Amino acid sequence: IPTEICRLFPKEDVIEVGYCSPTAFFHDVGEFDKERGGYYVDLSRKILIFLDQPHTMLLEHLRPMLSHDSKEITIKVTDKAEKHGMKTKNIFLLGYPSVVFCTAGMKIDEQEATRFLLLSPEIHQEKIREAIHEKIKRESDVTSYKSALSGNYDRFLLMQRIEAIKQAHITDIQISEEDAGELEKYFLEKVTSVKPRHQRDIGKVIGLVKVFALLNLWFRERMGATITANKEDIFNAYMLWDKISESQDLNLPPYVYNL
């Protein structure tokens, strides 16, 4: 699913990675900066997709970035030098990216579980039948299938909208004081007792509000590179979060929670 969705976005904004070691990832994605004496890795406004669960150490390195602790973080990694054994290297990581990783495994560290939205595809009978039908259509005639997909007008309009959002260069999305109060009231009403992880969960809800605002930026109050979310964005975020909040609270993907 992520690999298909990422095709809606400009190619230059998507980074797809299979397995790689933590050091290899930074070397491959980054560029050496002589002045700063380290590798500069610019992940800002990128979509980073790991096609399998990333190396544990790589996720550990990325945790401050995933938590939005700082726009730029410095990481020190060790690497084998040709003559002098192990050598420390500086990595300057610039965010923020949107990060997706796929795994069929059930063991996810709580550190990652609270930083990510845990999602799973629908697996009811009708959905599986549709998937089988699409698989047959695709494999029977790949060229015609891709041509039909490219010619889908709704898909084309969505891709154009995404490109237009990129070209708008929005740098900040605000929520009014009144709407922020409503957001807090809604969130606290949904939890019986607050936990430390809820500090990250409310961040996810706010992120959803901002996503809906960005998708409709032409119809939102705008001042320069800043837009303001409205009540419709908050309502849509509520509706989406309600569907997954209970499973997220238990660190479970919806599929497992609904068994």
Predicted regions and their residues:
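Phosphate-sensing "switch" segment of ASCE/P-loop ATPases
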Residues: 90-97, 104-259
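Conserved ASCE/P-loop NTPase catalytic core
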Residues: 1-131, 137-148
